[in-house]
Structures are given as C-alpha cells and as structure tokens.
From Swiss-Prot:
Gene name for this UniProt entry: Marf1
Occurrences of domain RRM (ranges): 781-860
Region Disordered, annotated ranges: 655-722, 1667-1714
One GO term (biological process): regulation of gene expression
Keywords: Differentiation, Meiosis, Oogenesis, Peroxisome, Phosphoprotein, Repeat, RNA-binding
Domain HTH OST-type stretches: 865-939, 993-1069, 1089-1163, 1165-1241, 1249-1324, 1325-1400, 1401-1475, 1476-1550
Modified residues (Phosphoserine): S65, S1081, S1083, S1684
Protein name, UniProt field: Meiosis regulator and mRNA stability factor 1
Length: 1730
C-alpha cells in the first residue's frame, strides 16, 4: 500500500473552529486542554480519578524554550489580533493541569494507549498509559494530551510530496513525543496544507461550520481547502460505517484545538509547519519573508507563544506552560533533517542505510555530488538514524572532484577495481548482507542502482528481514528489480537542476591598503621602512609613496584586515596615520592603481594589469544594495553574447578580485546585491556570491549605457521591486570566472528588458547548488601563443617567452608545437588564473623577434569543456561503423583530428553521450542510441520537415521493414523474398533526359505514397509512363539507380531488411522554388583519414570506364593505381564495405549481392565536371566555347573523346544546368548556345589592391620551402603571416582560385591529381633565389662560398634542400649563369668559388634616366627598348641591368615605382612613363632652366609656374597641402635652401643638363618628316644668323646661343648690361676635372659640339661634324644642299663620341675652349633682347 496514496489538493480557506452550543464533543477548545485553579474545566470531573499516581510522559525540563533566541532563526510575521478568540487572562498555577480534549471519551473508562514505541496495527513496545489517570495526577507537571492512535496511517506518495512528513509507518516513529489517544468513533483531521485531503469521518454526521480565515496558514504558504463532499461552501457532511473507520490525527493544535505544538530540536512548531516542504535553503526563507530585518539579539517578551514555522499565535494560557520548557536547552541549527525527540535517545530510531552504485547511477559531469547526497538525506532520513551511507566505485577512474565531495559529505567511498567484472555489484551486495546482519527490523534500505543483479538481495531484505526497501533507479530499470521494492523513485529527480561544481576556494588576489596623513617633511625611504615594520608581520609590501599617502599590498583580504587594525592611528614620525581600503578621491585611486607595482614592472602596459582586490566602503555602496547571502551567480550556457561593458581582461581581473573583501560579508549574511539599471517592473537582479563580476558589470553599464537609470534605481519603489524579484543565472562551466563578463547579454541593461527578451535563462536554484568544487586551474593555466616568429631558433624562442611571461608570475613550463608549415605555436603554463590574465593582457601583440605574438587563454585538454568534448566525440563516432570504435583507434583519430591529447578519464564523464564497454581484449567506445542520428547538414532553416537525414545516396533509415517489390505493378506475381537471390539482380542502364525523367519520378512517388521499391521501379514506371529506355551496352548508358539519385529531392534508402527503396529525402516533395544544391548533402566526413580516402576514391574512379568499378575489383585496382595496399583497419573498420559506406558523399554503391558496383555520386560528378569545364574554358583564347563545338574542344583540351556518361548523365545540358550561375554563363548567339566564364568588371581600386596582393603572395611564398605550398594551406598561412584575413571580395573575386589566376605573372597553380600546388613563376623564382643567395653569401666570410659547399650551407640556412630541377638546370655553373646579376664564379686554387658581384650605384643611374625621360617632349609612353638605346647613345656605354642587381631593365624600372610607371600593351611590348608627380617635376626643371643659375625664390615660384605652364598650381592634386611640401617630394630634381623669405628653389646639378628631345629621341628617321628650327632671339650687337638645323641633329636653344656667343669677343659678353630684375648672381666655382692632354696644343684643337651642323653665314653651306663610328649617323634631308668638306683642323682627324661624358655632366663644358680661359664656369640665362 506504500506509495499508492492519492492527492486531492485543496484551495478553499478554512476558518477558525468555533465551539457552538450544538457542537459535537470531539470539537474541543484549545483552552480546554489546560486546567486552572480559578476555572473548572467541563470534563475535569470525569477524568480526575484516572490522573493519579501516573508517571509523567514528558518532563518539563526536557522541553526547550520556544522563545530561545537560537530557536528563532527568523521572527514571526505579524498576525491579526486574535484576542477575541482567547479565553480571559488568568494566572496559572505553578503546577498546571491538563484536561482531556474533546476527542477523549465521555464515559469513565478510556482505552489504554501505547506511548513511545510501537508502529502499525500490532502496536509497539511502548508503555500503556491511561489518559484518565494521567490527566488526574496532581503531581505531574506534564502536558500529555495524546490524539489519535498508534495505527499506521495511509501516506501520501513521497514522489508527490517529498517534504511532507505524513508518510508515517507508526506514530511513534515519526512523532514519538506526541501523545496518542484511541477512540473507536474517531475521525482523522488533517491540516489544510493542500497536499492532503479530508479522510472519511465516522458514522455520526459531523458538521463543520463556516470558519474564519486562518491568517497564519496564508502567511505560511498553505493552500486553503475548497472541495467539501456536501457541495456546500465551508461545510462537510459524510456518513460512513464502522468498517471504514480510520484513526485520526489532529495535526494543528492551534487551528483544530487539539494538542500543544510539537518541539523539534528546541524550536516550537505546529504540525502544519512539519508538513510543509522542507526549508533547505535560505532562498526559500527569503522568498517567504522578503522584508524582514535581521533577527534581533534581544529576547522577545514571552507574552504569547508563536509557532516558529508559520507564525501562528496561541492562547495566552499557553505562555506559562511553554515557558516552563525553557530550561536551558540549546536549539539546534534550523533545517536539520533529523526530528529531535525530547526525552528519547537517538538509538531508538529505526536505522537507514544507503547503498549507491555510483557507476550505474552517476553524477552528471560538472555537477555537484554534494547536492545529490543532501537531497537523498533530506528525502529519506526523517525519523531515521543514519547507519550506513556507502558508494562503490573505482576512485582512479571517477572524477576526483566527485570523490572529494563525497568524502566531505561523510559518505563511505569503497574502492574497487573497475576492470574486474561485477566488482562494484559484489561489493554492494556484501554491504547489504552485512547491514542485514547488523540491524533488525524496522529498518530502511535505500538502493541507488538500476542493475538487476541486486534483485536477490532486495527480495531477502524485504521478505525475510522485514526491511523497508526504497529503490532509486533510472528509467531503464528491469521489472525484476522494481518488483522487490516498497517504494520506487526515479534517480532523475535527484540529478535534475543540479548546480555546477564551483571552485572550493577562490585564488588569492592582492588587496591594497591606502595609508594617509603621512609626514611630508620626511624622505620616502624612511617612511617606507617605518610602514614596512608596521605591516611586515602581516605580509605587507609598500608599493608607492606619494606626498602624504602610500599604498600597501597584501596577499589576501585577511592579512589586509589584520594590518588595518594594527596600523590604524599608529605614529609615523609624529603623525597619526589613517588606514583605509579605499582611496579618498577617484583621481588618487586611478593614479595609484596604474602605479601599483611600479617597483617590479617598468613597462606602462604591464603596470595596468596588476591584479588587485579593490574594496569599497559600505558608505559608497548604492542604497539599492541588499543583503542576500547564499546566492551564486550562474550564467546560462546558451548565451554567447559578449558584453560591451568589459573593455579588457584587466578590468575583469579587477572586478573578479573585488569579491575578496565581500566574502566576509557573505559569511555574516551581509552580501551585496547589484541591481540592474532597469526602470521596468520586471527587472531581474542577479545575486553574487564569491565573485565580483556582476556588480561592477551592471554598475558600469548603468554609467555608460543608461545614465538616467541611477535615480531610478535609488528610488524606494524600484528598490522594493528589485528586492522582490530575484533571479539567478546558471554557469555550467568551470571557466565561469572568465565567461561571466562576456556572456551577460547587453539586453540586461536595457530599460525595456523582460525575461522573454533576454537570451539568458534565469532560474531559481537551490542554495546547495552553490557548493564549491575544486579549482579547475589548480594544476596551472595554459596560455596559447600564436603568430610566433619562426625565424628564431626554438631554444632562443623558448628563452624569450620564458623571460616575457615570468615578469607576470611563475611560469611552470613553455612548450613549442612542431615546426610544420611555419605554423609555430607555443603553450605557456602559468601558476594561477590571475597571473595568466595579467600576462595575456600585457603581452598580447607584444613584439618578440620580428612578429607581434597573439596571446589567449587556453583551457587545454584537462580543462576542456565537457560539452565541447561531447560534440567532438559525437562527430567522430557518427562517422564510425555502428557508431562504435575501439578505444585506441578513437584516441588516435581524435588526436589527429583536433591536434591535442585526449584524457581518457574525461570520456567516462560523458555518460549521456557515449558508453565505454569491455569487449574481448580491449574497450569499445560506443555512441548512445539517442545521439546516433546525425543532424541534418542543411540545418533547420533549410530542412523542410526537420528531418535528421544526411541526404547521402545510400542511407539507412528508420525503415524497419519494407516490401521488396510493389505488389500492384510487379510483373513477377510469384516473387518471394525468401527465394530471391540478390546475385541474380542485374543493374539496368538507361538513356534518358533528366529534365523529362525528374517530374515523372516525383509523380510516381506521389502515387505510391512516397516510396517505390527499387526492384519493381521499372515495372511501376512502365505502368505509368511506358517502358524505360534500357540499353544493353553498359558503356552507352547510366545505371538507373545512380540516375534516380541525380533528381533533386529524391534518394534511395536501404531498409533494415536490406531492401532499397526510392523515396523523397524529406518524406515529402520539395518546394517548387528550392535550389537543387540545398537538396545535396555536404560532406559528413570529419575524419582526416576518410577525407584523404575519399580523394583517392575519386582519383581511382576517374580512370575507370564510365567511372564504374565492381566492388570486388576495388582492392586490386587501388593497389595497381596507387602502388600501396588499402588497409581497412587503418581507417578503423573491419570490412571493406563499411569503409566504402563511410564516404557516402563521394561513393555510391549500386546493386546488391556480390555483383555490386561502385561509382561517384552525382554531387561528386558535378564538382568534377565543373573543374574540367573551367579548365577547358580557360584553355580557349576567348574564354568561351560553343556547345556545338564542345566535343572537339574537349578532345583538344584533355586528349580524349567526350563521353557524357563519364559524368553520370545522358545529356550535356543536364549536368550544365547543375553548375551554379556564379561559375559559368550561358548565352545565346545566333542559333548556338555559348558557355563562358562569368566575370565581373572590377573597379580600379580592386585592380590596385590585386597588385598589392601579388606582392603579398611573393612575400608569403618566399618563406615557403621551394617557393611552393599546397592550395588548401594558402588561407591559413596568409592569415598567420600577415595577421589579417584574405577577403576575396576586397579584390573583386568570389573564389580564391580566380584571385590567384588573376596574377599569372606572379603565381602558377599546378595540379597534382586532386591536389593543387601554388608556386612562383620562373621569373619570380629566380628573384627569390637571388635574394636567398645574397643572404647566404653575406653571412659567409668574405662574401664568398665554395661551390661544393653550396648545398650544405643552403640547407643549414633555409631549412630545406636545394633542388636544381626547380630551375631547369643540371649544374651549379649553369645556375650561376642565370644569376649573373647577383653572383659570379671565380676559379681559386681550392676550386670554384661563388662570389657576390659589386653592384653599381642605382642613384646615379636613376638621375640619368630621369634626365632622359624629362628631356623627351610628350606625355605618351616611351618603349623601354628605346629608352635603353637613347641611354647608350647619350652616355656611350651599354646599359647592363645585371650590374645593378636586376635581370632586365623592366625590373629595374619597376623598382622605381614613385618615379616611373611600366605597362605592357596587347603585343607584350613594355612602355615606361613618368608618374604624375614627376611630370610636374619635369615642368619645374624646364622652368628653372630659364632662370640664371637655375634657381628662383620660393615665394615667386607659384606665379612663375603659372605663367610658364599656363595653369594654376594645385598641390592638393598631387596629395600635398602646400607648394613647399610638393617641391620637397621631388628631391631628385630640386632642393630648397635658405630661410624665411629668402628661401630659394635650386635645381639639382644632375638635372642641369639640357638635352634636346629632337637630338635624343631620333627613332625611325626615315619615317619622320624633316623639321627645321630657327634661333630668332640673339643680342642686337650681333647679326642675326639663320641656322637651318635638321631634325634630331640640332642642339638645344641654350647650346646654340652659347656656340654663337663663343665666336665673339668675351669682352662683349662681360660688358653686356645685366637686367635689374634678375637676382644678384651667386658666383661659385664649378671645378673642371681635366683629363691628361697636351695643354700646349690647347688652342689648336677647338672643341665643337658634335652632331651639329654649323652653317657658315657667308657661304650658307653645311659643315658636318664627324661622328664616331658605331653610333647613329645623321641623315641629311633631301632639301638640304650638298655637304661641304669640314674645315681644316684636328677635329676632322680625331673624331669624338656623339656626347661625351663631360658634356653630359656640365652644360658649361660644352663651350668650345678657343680664346679665353675663364677663372670659373658660370651658368647663363637665355639671352634676351634688352
């Protein structure tokens, strides 16, 4: 009958009982229980003779005082005045007498009662007491009103009312202190608690009158009664026979006027409070009495007894009676689960033993085992004494935190060997047998297990020993086990809503003390010594002294508090100091916190990261802060919103450390509550315990996001609302100290916040959930360091990291990851979390070597979140056959896939995800059935019905059985599944159009309720649409089974009986507008080994005819193709078919039986065709192909005939339509369809960014071995190398391959099977190699290296071997010939030696090229070859770029990007042009050539430039703000000298050479018309001479003037008037370096400018000057007269080059030295007419 009780919840208020005149005798008054000398009770005459000479049942000294301060943990709530219900106040006698209640019989005899023992109908061993004699005894000072009998009462189910204590085996077992009476016509009266219902009354009709409402019940949280059998409100009438009579229990002495209150461990409680749910938490108490101040230490006046539970007041007559019980009994702590019975020894309680199979019913991972133990004790231990509490497990395999919590709870943990079979069960069975031998009935056994092996022991304990058996089991318990238990309870009730384990102790953080009123006239060292002596015994350290204040640091809060007491008001050099935890001013606080550890840390960055406990006085707290101890801040794991209020980890460290001072307040019950800045009535308030995160978080959000919320929060109305609404946030992770500041949603700080809008789930949690767990960072904190400079040696790098991190705390270890692909990382382990946070905040982006390291916290394998481990485990096991893997294979796959070690003990914590089973000689990791269904790769947003199908072509679904054929259309009516031979099935090959076939299949599925068996599909199709076009030649068709899977939304599933069924993917037709690609599955494979295997399968099947291969031929074909064996066990499988089915996104198995075929899936075929099509289109010159010519183009590109069935379809259009529109473009030209690559026109900015990207690619690949890298490594390597993402849209592309193909001059993409390799082009490779050779040779002694040592030194320097074949050479000598611009080979005695060549200065060459380009008239591009020719003509020396370190002149010009622009036209011709800035410089040079000495005042430059060029000078068009900045940007042309207004713009000497564009750029002479030019401006003192000059042969105007003036007397030149507008000449000598010559014959050899025809004025004849042989000769125009012989002179005998080097350097040297030798050369302005 146990556990079968029913409930009838009541809701109507029950009033006070009144004893009217017609009231029945059992309705007795409360005051009638006590006799007084002045008042004779109505029944005293009838009971007096039975109350003599009887021993007292309860001594007054055993009754504790109900008004004891310790017993009143919470004061009672105010109650309404009930004086009208009390009897007149009378003086009680010293020895009170108690009369029998109305339940006692009226006749002279009463039935005897058993007291103090028995239970059940058989009674117990208690003494027999006659109530009459007991109450009549004048010498007793006892209160022994007993109500009810000793019969067992029917209990309410403990599952429904766990905390109600009405499940009485016997009255003496639960309430042995209550006196019991027996009355045959009795009625069981129960309180109006809502959980109980009125039982049947005896045969007499009892009438309950309308009662007043019970204020006490309402305040205590009771639910009033409502349903009465009679239907009348407030009345109850029932008739019952004597056979239905049950004993009655008056449960509330105050409400039902039955018995005095029951004393529980020294506190006074009525029965209603005993039946209430247990108050195990202060949270519930705070919820019931939210506004009650802390209890007063003054004892309350003992006027009226009040129930400590519900607060109901009793009669004043009870005062003296209850006062008599307060004889010094010390009250126990409130909330103890045991029922303390006055005058009874604990050993008389029945024993109870708990036996816990913790391996079978385990504590959920990360949850508190303390709470589970507490819940077990609270539920079962009332009225019992704990005799045994044991759990059995392997302590080496169980979580250490769980074992520690069990030990702390005084639970016996028995260790067994987990590898031994049934070791835990055997140990528990032994403990059960010992318990039965030790204890006798009545006793209770609680077994926490689901193992059926305990059925035998439970049967014996219940039926042979008479024990009460309680079984706590899981859902999967066996009926054989459940049958032997008296009471069944699900284990999930104990583990539901378990709080997470939190660290047992918070890591210590430093605490600051601020010292004020220090003497200002003393030096800091003396004050520091004095303060150190005062604080040394408390572990203090003086951080800084500023003015009259100082800061001291202590290791924890306790030391700081002790130091504050000792140092307060101490004398320091005559001043009484003041010590405080908080600074006086905010500015002082900010200043000191930034200089807290200045003596240790010098860097300003590191100073900011001091971990300190910053403590505020209570006076600075907000008035809304409310004391609420016992709360724990917990955050929901579902929220990942990062708050914007926490700026850095340093702030988090400060806020976390603030909890240090508040811990003591929490212990005293004065915790602080941070109110949310929310003005709404639904504002929630997180409660903080031991963490200082929430308060600063919301305080900062109040200041930053809601400035107006401060006054709102401080309002009394809002304070009350916030105090009444209390929530908690649950943090399941042990990393909650860091996540707390990140996962609190910003919505919490919004004024319109509501619980529905918040992403956080707020739950009221049991305070026991706050039980701390061991610190997850007790063994150290791992810090991950990335972006490490891989150029440093490992030893050097390890030392640098050790030094950097040791400045912030103790470094336990520094580990470097393997040096692969230059992705070098480091793991630094520090001692505690605080030091790690400070190190992360300080060293993030700290430069070590040549890179800025990236630092972040890493929990590592030991601290990895179990939820993440569960997800990773599921992803691996879901790809495994039967979702199981051997443990060693699972560990190997896990570590290869995720790159870190796996702690096997963590796997045992995933009890809700996996199961580890012993099998044979090893362990097997299996996924539980509830987690085996793979989630849809499309996601819930793309899935039509939320199906978990993975959309693979071959799918095992929940089809337990399916008919092998369609009975309606199958042609073979005699088909039998038993007779059918799978090997006889022949796969049909069809030739159909997919566009026609797809709607037919959907229609066929519609008529067949969504499924069609594959065997009868041809028959069903023929019945609907006619016969299929089946071909007998398998090479000319497509397998029907594969062709069906090409239809979007249709799949072929395999039922569990092996029948293949055609069905819809989502069990219904797809929507009409669904993208076909959404119906294709993504790769479900996550195992790197399987990914590699899938690539190998694709590569193998591509070589097979029609991409079809029999399964039986796979192994030999694999061996023949790859030259290696295919070991199935290497992938974790035992059968080949299981391995093939593990890659369903790539491989499709066709047919059945032993003749199965394998082919590529349609998804893989489309991907393969797309790659081939793009390759074909890129091979075309026009990047397009006509469909009509597709076969021919395919043959030219791939050297094989086109066969569309190779790609699994029958029509080209079918597979082209599967390619996304973003990849190719189909267009119609005339009557033909054209396929082309879709390209988007890129903007000019994107083109410029692509050019910069090409430079990045060169830089990246130069750091890779052999200047190449895999394609799939490019993105991570780019991110790691440059510290930024490679965003394709930034360059105008959508695919990485397209971006890389856009720089063909830099990068090549090589295809090696399925893999793509990126490598530099040949030109870029040689550039990179040249840079390596320069670096290598410069590191050698003498910048040279023996040729034989080249390979060895190269490998030592760069870490990989040198390969000659990469450069298409066979020897080092041939290689050096290609690097002749960098190295040269010298023959030495010891052998050939490689040496660096001496490069010429590029600066002088740059100036010479600039002069050439600026002297050329025009803005158009100039061919590079012509520029070379003009250079060689001008300077009479070949231009060899190798001498300057470049292979070609184009590369040399590209190295000058700010001077010139180089471009290439469609004919691959290279042109060069000045940049816009140097076009401006060209104009400046021309302008300055018109001035004396090529200089001009700066303030006159703009006006002169405007007049000369004809346009206004705008510096902003060139990117500069002023003319001075603009001129400063062309230092190769001009420079500015002087100061203030006298600043002068001067032309550089290199730019003073004036070369005529007609003279220099004489190209294609025969194609250019003759042009004549005259010199018109000459001085008046001379005759005007007309000089006819041919194109390209005349000098510049200045040179002509100089030549003409040279023939005159120098006196005329010196005597010519100087214009007054010209500035004063600044004479400075231009030294002439004379070559060795015959100075005596100086006058006999006048120098004439070469290449110039001087016309004699008289003869008008041409005088050709000789030209050096080998240079370009000047052709005479057809209109010119015949050339006359040259005048006699040595010039005709000794010809000179066309332009001498001296002539180029200085225009003054071009003057013929004929008559006068000037002391210095001067620059001349053009001679103008005065």
């Amino acid at each position: 009958m146990e556990g079968k009780g029913t409930e009838n919840p009541c809701s109507r208020t029950l009033g006070w009982f009144h004893q009217d005149n017609d009231a029945k005798p059992w309705l007795w008054k409360f005051s009638g229980c006590f006799s007084r000398p002045e008042q004779t009770l109505p029944l005293s005459s009838q009971t007096k003779e039975y109350m003599e000479n009887k021993k007292a049942a309860v001594e007054l000294k055993d009754i504790p005082s109900p008004l004891h301060v310790g017993s009143k943990f919470f004061p009672a709530v105010p109650l309404p005045d009930i004086r009208s219900l009390q009897q007149p106040k009378v003086q009680l006698s010293a020895i009170p007498k108690v009369s029998c209640c109305a339940h006692c019989p009226n006749e002279p005899s009463t039935s005897p009662m058993r007291f103090g023992g028995g239970s059940g109908s058989s009674g117990g061993s208690g003494s027999l007491i006659h109530t009459g004699s007991l109450l009549d005894s004048p010498s007793t000072g006892t209160v022994t009103c007993q109500v009810g009998s000793g019969f067992a009462f029917q209990s309410v189910s403990s599952l429904q009312n766990a905390s109600t204590r009405n499940n009485l085996v016997g009255l003496s077992s639960d309430f042995p202190s209550m006196c019991v009476e027996s009355n045959l016509p009795s009625c069981k009266h129960l309180s109006c608690c809502g959980k109980l219902h009125f039982q049947s009354c005896h045969s007499n009709v009892h009438k309950l009158h309308q009662f007043q409402n019970l204020q006490g019940c309402a305040s205590a949280g009771y639910f009033p009664c409502s349903d009465f059998p009679s239907g009348a409100p407030g009345h109850l009438e029932e008739r019952l026979s004597h056979s239905e009579l049950t004993p009655h229990l008056c449960t509330n002495s105050l409400h039902l006027n039955v018995a005095p209150p029951v004393c529980l461990k020294g506190s006074l409680y009525c029965e209603d409070c005993l039946n209430k749910p247990a108050r195990n938490s202060i949270i519930d108490a705070a919820k019931i009495w939210p506004n009650i101040p802390p209890p007063s230490t003054q004892p309350a006046p003992p006027a009226i007894p009040v129930c400590n539970g519900c607060g109901t007041k009793g009669m004043e007559k009870e005062t003296s009676l209850l006062l008599a019980t307060s004889l010094g009994k010390t009250a126990s702590k409130f909330g103890s689960p045991e029922v303390a019975v006055t005058g009874q020894v604990l050993e008389t309680l029945p024993p109870i033993g708990v036996f816990w199979d913790i391996e079978n019913c385990s504590v959920p991972s990360g949850r508190s085992a303390t709470t589970v133990v507490q819940r077990i004790r609270e539920k079962f231990f009332r009225g019992h004494r704990e005799a045994e509490f044991i759990c059995v497990c392997d302590i080496s395999k169980e979580n250490k935190e769980v074992i520690q919590e069990l030990n702390n709870c005084q639970v016996t943990v028995a260790h067994i060997n987990a590898t031994a079979k049934n070791a835990a069960d055997d140990k528990l069975r032994q403990s059960l047998r010992r318990f039965a031998n030790t204890h006798t009935a009545p006793a209770t056994v609680v077994l926490v297990s689901t193992d059926v092996n305990f059925a035998l022991e439970l049967s014996d304990l219940r039926h042979r020993h008479g024990f009460h058996i309680i079984l706590v089991h899981k859902n999967q318990a066996s009926e054989a086990l459940l049958h032997h238990a008296n009471q069944l309870i699900r284990f999930e009730e104990f583990i539901s809503d378990l709080p997470p384990r939190l660290p047992l102790k918070i890591p210590q953080c430093h605490t600051l003390l601020y010292v004020y009123n220090l003497p200002a006239n003393k030096d800091g060292k003396s004050i520091s010594n004095r303060l150190r002596r005062l604080s040394d015994n408390c572990g203090g350290k003086v951080l800084s002294i500023t003015g009259c204040s100082a800061i001291l640091r202590f290791i924890n809060q306790d030391s700081a508090e002790r130091a504050q007491k000792r140092m307060e008001n101490e004398d320091v050099f005559g001043n009484r100091i003041i010590v405080s935890f908080t600074p006086k001013h905010r500015e002082f606080f900010e200043a000191k916190s930034s200089n807290a550890i200045a003596d240790k840390v010098k860097s300003p960055k590191k100073v900011k990261n001091t971990k300190l406990c910053l403590i505020k006085d209570t006076s600075e707290q907000s008035p809304s802060v409310k004391a609420m101890p016992g709360k724990v801040l917990q955050a929901n794991s579902g929220s990942a919103t990062k708050t914007t209020n926490i700026k850095s980890l340093q702030e988090l460290c400060r806020m976390e450390s603030k909890s240090g001072n508040r811990n003591s307040d929490h212990q005293q019950g004065h915790g602080r509550l941070a109110a949310l800045p929310n003005s709404g009535p639904t504002a929630s308030v997180p409660i903080v315990k031991n963490t200082g995160v929430t308060e600063p978080l919301y305080r900062s959000s109040q200041k930053k996001e809601n400035p107006s919320s401060q006054s709102t929060v401080n309002s009394p109305v809002e304070k009350k609302k916030r105090e009444e609404t209390v929530f908690q946030v649950s943090y399941p992770s042990a990393f909650s100290k860091l996540i707390a500041s990140r996962q609190v949603s910003p919505l919490l700080t919004s004024q319109s916040w509501s619980p529905r809008a918040s992403p956080l789930a707020f739950n009221i949690a049991n305070p026991s959930s706050g039980a701390d767990c061991p610190d997850p960072f007790a063994n150290g904190v791992d810090i991950q360091v990335s972006n490490v400079d891989y150029r440093l040696s490992r030893k050097e790098l390890q030392q640098l990291l050790q030094e950097a991190f040791s400045k912030h705390g103790q470094v336990k270890s520094v580990e470097l990851s393997p040096h692969t692909d230059y992705q070098l990382k480091a793991i630094v382990q520090m001692r505690n979390l605080h030091e790690a946070i400070c190190a992360v905040n300080s060293l993030h982006r700290h430069k070590i070597g040549s890179k800025k390291i990236l630092v972040s916290l890493s929990t590592g394998a030991a601290n990895k979140s179990l939820s993440l481990l569960s997800t990773e485990t599921m992803s691996i096991l879901q790809d495994a056959p039967a979702c199981c893997l051997p443990l060693f294979k699972f560990i190997d796959i896990y570590e290869k896939k995720y790159g870190h070690k796996l702690n096997v003990s963590d796997l045992y914590k995933l009890t809700d995800t996996i199961a580890i089973r012993e099998q044979g000689n090893g362990r097997l990791v299996c996924l539980l059935p509830s987690n085996q269904a793979r989630q849809s790769p499309l996601g819930s947003s793309q899935s039509h019905d939320g199906s978990s199908s993975n959309c693979s072509p071959v799918l095992f679904e929940e089809l337990e059985y399916h008919e092998p054929v369609c009975k309606q259309h199958c042609s073979n009516k005699d088909f039998s599944e038993l007779v059918f031979d799978p090997d006889s099935y022949k796969i049909p090959f069809v030739v159909l159009s997919l566009k026609v076939f797809a709607p037919q299949v959907h229609s066929l599925l519609q008529t067949h309720q969504g499924t069609v068996p594959l065997l009868s599909f041809p028959d069903c199709y023929a019945a609907e649409f006619g016969d299929l076009e089946i071909t007998q030649d398998s090479h000319k068709g497509v397998p029907l089974e594969h062709f069906i899977t090409c239809i979007p939304g249709v799949n072929i599933a395999t039922a569990q009986n092996g029948v293949k069924v055609v069905k819809w993917i989502h069990n219904k037709p797809p929507p009409p507008n669904t993208d076909p690609w959404l119906l294709r599955s993504k790769s479900p494979v996550r195992n790197p080994q399987l990914i590699q295997f899938s690539r190998e399968v694709i590569d193998l099947l591509k070589t097979q005819p029609s991409c079809i291969l029999p399964v039986s031929n796979f192994i030999p074909s694999y061996h023949h193709h790859f030259g290696k064996q295919c070991r199935v066990s290497d992938y974790g499988y035992s059968k080949l078919i299981e391995l093939l089915e593990a890659v369903p996104h790539v491989l499709q198995i066709l047919g059945m039986g032993s003749k199965r075929l394998m082919t590529l899936t349609h998804r893989a075929q489309v991907k393969r065709f797309t790659q081939d099509l793009l390759k074909l289109l890129k091979s075309q010159a026009s990047k397009q192909v006509i469909v009509r010519d597709f076969s021919q183009a395919y043959h030219w590109c791939f050297s094989k005939d086109w066969d569309v069935t190779e790609y699994g379809v029958c029509d080209l259009i079918d597979i082209i339509s599967e390619i996304p529109d973003t990849t190719i473009c189909l267009s119609q030209q005339d009557d033909d369809m054209v396929i082309c690559i879709r390209k988007r026109e890129r903007t000019q900015d994107e083109i410029e960014r692509t050019k910069q990207f090409s430079k990045d690619v060169v830089d990246l690949l130069r750091h890779q071995p052999h200047f190449r890298m895999p394609f799939n490594k490019f993105i991570p390597s780019y991110h790691h190398h440059f510290g930024r993402q490679c965003k394709l849209a930034y360059y105008g592309f959508t695919k990485l391959l397209e971006l890389l193909e856009a720089i063909p001059e830099i990068l090549q993409v090589l295809e090696c099977g399925e893999e793509k390799i990126l490598t530099l082009t040949e030109v870029e490779r040689f550039k990179a190699l040249a840079a390596q050779f320069v670096k290598l040779l410069r590191s050698q002694k003498g910048n040279c290296l023996m040729m034989t040592d080249l390979f060895t030194e190269y490998a030592k320097t760069f870490g990989y071997t040198f390969r000659l074949q990469d450069y298409d050479v066979s020897s080092v000598s041939a290689l050096t010939q290609k690097l002749c611009h960098v190295v040269k080979v010298a023959d030495m005695e010891s052998g050939k030696q490689i040496q660096l060549i001496n490069r010429k200065s590029l600066r002088s060459l740059t100036a010479q090229l600039l002069v050439l380009l600026m002297s050329w008239e025009g803005d158009a591009y100039l061919p590079v070859d012509e520029l070379r020719r003009h250079y060689e003509t001008t300077h009479s020396t070949p231009l060899n770029p190798c001498e300057y370190g470049f292979m070609t002149l184009t590369e040399l010009l590209k190295s000058l990007p700010y001077l010139v622009e180089v471009c290439t036209n469609d004919k691959a011709e290279e042109y060069v042009k000045l940049t816009s800035l140097y076009l401006f410089a060209k104009n400046v040079r021309s302008l300055l050539h018109t001035y004396h000495y090529q200089q001009i005042f700066l303030h006159e430059f703009s006006m002169a430039y405007n007049k000369y060029v004809g346009e206004t000078l705008q510096p902003k068009t060139y990117g500069y703000s002023s003319v001075e900045e603009l001129l400063g940007a062309i230092p190769q042309v001009v420079w500015i000298k002087g100061h203030g207004h006298k600043r002068i713009v001067v032309l550089k000497n290199d730019m003073k050479n004036r070369l005529s564009s007609f003279d220099l750029f004489s190209v294609n002479h025969e194609d250019q018309p003759a042009v004549s030019r005259q010199i018109l401006a000459v001085p008046e003192s001379h005759l005007a001479s007309e000089l006819q000059l041919r194109t390209g042969t005349g000098p510049s105007q200045m040179e002509q003037e100089l030549l003409h003036l040279a023939s005159s007397s120098p006196v005329d030149l010196l005597c010519a008037p100087v214009p007054s507008c010209l500035p004063s000449p600044q004479l400075r000598p231009d030294p002439v370096i004379l070559k060795p010559a015959d100075l005596i014959q100086f006058e006999e050899h006048p120098q004439e400018p070469l290449g110039v025809l001087v016309l004699n004025q008289e003869e008008k004849s041409e005088v050709p000057l000789p030209v050096q042989k080998g240079n370009l000769s000047c052709d005479s125009s057809p209109s010119s007269p015949a050339a006359s012989p040259a005048p006699p002179g040595p010039s005709s005998e000794a010809p000179r080059p066309l332009f001498s080097k001296d002539a180029v350097e200085s225009p003054a040297k071009k003057q013929p030295k004929n008559r006068v030798k000037l002391a210095a050369n001067f620059s001349f302005a053009p001679v103008t007419k005065l």
